[in-house]
Amino acid sequence: NLRKAKIEKIIAQFEFDPLLEIKAKHLSGGQKKKLVISMALINDPKILLLDEPFAALDILTIKMLQNIIVSLQSIDKITVIVCDHQARDLLSCVDRAIVLSNGKIIASGSPSEIIKDSTAKSEYFGDEFKIN
């Protein structure tokens, strides 16, 4: 059954095995966030919109989510649109980005182009910004 295979893939991808018997109300904030994202993937979307997916997550969960985003884009061929204020976390897992300031685009391009952009540096990142 394709649906069962999809669910099993998501369980493995999001490392849900130890959590399968726990009710959602007892999950941590990061676990709940992963659950919501995984639920969006059940119906094989062509586009996935994530609003501040890295907010309030520990570093291990951020890294796992970054890897999932990269995998969704490269392997599953899903367009992932991420809106986030955490530039370092965001630029570590996307191939293109747009930087807004006061509702206007101030930079657009690959992560390496974005961090070199003088307007993005002065208004958003600062001179010492680096991607991990």
Task: Give residue ranges: language-model regions.
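Conserved ABC ATPase "signature" region
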Residues: 2-19, 70
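Conserved ABC ATPase signature
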Residues: 23-27
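Hydrophobic anchor residue at the start of the ABC signature
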Residues: 37
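Conserved catalytic motifs of ABC-family nucleotide-binding domains
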Residues: 44
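Catalytic Walker B motif of ABC-type/P-loop ATPase nucleotide-binding domains
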Residues: 48-51
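Helical segment within the ABC ATPase nucleotide-binding domain
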Residues: 63-75
